[in-house]
Amino acid sequence: MSKAPPLRLGVNIDHIATLRNARGGRHPDPLRAAFAAIEAGADGITAHLREDRRHIRDADMQRLKAEISKPLNFEMAATDDMIRIALGVKPHAVCLVPERREELTTEGGLDVVGQQASLGPAIARFNDAGIRTSLFIAADPAQIEMAAKLKAPAIEIHTGAWCDAITDGDAAKANTEWQRIFAGAALARSAGLEVHAGHGLDYATAETISELPQIVELNIGFYMIGEALFVGLGETVRAMRAAMDRGRAKAIAA
């Protein structure tokens, strides 16, 4: 039997804030969603404070840090302003992501190789502050190796291309992307990085990727918030947790 570590579920609540902001005001409250997710079994809460504040706002991050009982993962672009805000909030972790104002969601992985001169000092500042840093990257060997060189504690593998290929019915592309993820997770772990994954995951893909023993955390948001409209957030978190547990059980039995 292999030694697969426990697998954490981070619930991204950005799109609770998207719905709130569509009408203004305070309802629905992202903090209430965080409480519900944690009660249902989430191991942490993820929120992305974008530069345009299109969903999560500064006050949301402060409230989440002050009131939730589980770790807060602060997704952010590595800008001077966001670094200053994150150091003030002092979350358990930050996940550095690429960001473009015109995108609907994070479209690709961070170019760690191309941005090493700016990312290195940012990672060092967070490490010094006791805030764990992960880098949201494609499962590309050069990016993974640079993440390790810059002393990032963790990476989050971008699973979007794999999930999109499955949704589109493109089996060949899905297999190619899966092989990249499979190899990338192994390379990252051998380089001493903690390995997370996320973007576009649903119940089926979360179960599949949970079979990779190197991965210790999945961060999932949009699919779960969509499902919650029909069955409730608590039930969605429990169903996702069950899917992950089924996948991890296969890894342990292998």
Swiss-Prot record:
GO molecular function, one term: pyridoxine 5'-phosphate synthase activity
Places the protein is found: Cytoplasm
Name of the gene encoding the protein in the UniProt record: pdxJ
Active-site residues from the entry: H48, E75, H199
UniProt keyword list: Cytoplasm, Pyridoxine biosynthesis, Transferase
Species annotation: Rhodopseudomonas palustris (strain ATCC BAA-98 / CGA009)
GO-annotated biological processes: pyridoxine biosynthetic process
Swiss-Prot/TrEMBL catalytic activity: 3-amino-2-oxopropyl phosphate + 1-deoxy-D-xylulose 5-phosphate = pyridoxine 5'-phosphate + phosphate + 2 H2O + H(+)
Sites where the protein binds 3-amino-2-oxopropyl phosphate: N12, R23, G200, G221, F222
UniProt name for this protein: Pyridoxine 5'-phosphate synthase
